[in-house]
Amino acid sequence: MGKVKRNAPCPCGSGKKYKKCCGSKVVDFPAELAAKEAKQIQEDLVEYAFTVHRESISGFINQHDFLSAMDRQTKDISVFNLGIWGIFFHPLAGEKTIFEEYLQKKGDSITRPKTREIVESWQSMTPALLLLKDLKEGIIHFEDVITAKQFEVEMDASNQDLPPVGSLILGYPIHEAEKAEFFMQFTIFPVKRTEALISKVKKYADAAVKDGKTPEDFMKQEFNNVLFALLAEKDEEPQAEKAEVSTVEWANDLEKETAAAIEEGMSGEEYPTELIPAVIDIWKTFCEKKSPVIRKPEAFAAAVEYYVNAISLNGASVSQAKLAKKYGVSASTISSRYKEIESTLQDEADRFAQALSS
């Protein structure tokens, strides 16, 4: 850490002069400050990658043909994961990775030793597919599906909806100060797909191990195959509920995209599979009566899910804030779209409520 002048404000954030605070004693700066700085550096690193090396990282991402067949939400998830993979594991900055170049150019500006220690530890980061084994008092116990290693993450249940036991989590585990975390964000897969998805990924992993790779090398070197298995590869058995969107005639692609977003968003454990056709019928009826102007399909998808919960005779309540986080839109936008749907479908509300409850 650079030398702090005695009369300068103390870097610990106390508001006191350095000579009257940490300068008068040997002290470790709060781990929380280091973790906060590390999170900011995560964002700065990604921004650096997509500005300074925009062409190389975009070319790296777009070489994966499976992206073209994905819906918008799935593609966004894939692009994020491929981007982080490219930043850390591919020499997209000459002979260096983008992360290595970033650390070389900006490392000296990271003055807090603990923060620098956290950031440098990202060099040993490995992508992971984790099975949620247990959840107690905000501590989540994971098992790495590929390496069988155990992993614990502390999550605040008051600030986010915690995934259910049995879920699969895809992400980049790291350590921030005294606790484990994920690099920026992670992806949750529904419990009902866990067994099938693990089977798909292990086919690729087993083949790599037979070729002499370690499980860790497989995740670092063939992460694109993991993404393909999880997000792009078709299930061996056709899912009947998926046919609903494709068999309906839509006025335009945005209406169809919204229907797909509704189906995707409501295919988790909260709702029975047989509910989906009735929900798609609600969206279809609204489109026929209103011909909505759709700027972001996820906004209407969230509003439809909220509407379903509002009118269903046996639906579980769900907040607009929770749906905003789920669909990546604002709560105020959901509120506006919900009012639009509610007013348009006043005459059909009782019929839809009965259909949803039967």
Swiss-Prot record:
Supply the CDD domains for this chain: CYCLIN_SF
- Report whether Transmembrane shows up as a keyword of the record: no
Domain of life assignment? Bacteria
For the ligand (ATP), the binding residues are 207-214
Keyword Magnesium included in the entry's annotation? no
Show the disulfide pairing. none
Q: Which UniProt keywords apply?
A: ATP-binding, Nucleotide-binding
- What InterPro entries would the database entry show? Cyclin-like_sf (IPR036915), HTH_Psq (IPR007889), SEC_C_motif (IPR004027)
Q: What is this protein called?
A: Uncharacterized protein YccF
The record's gene field reads: yccF
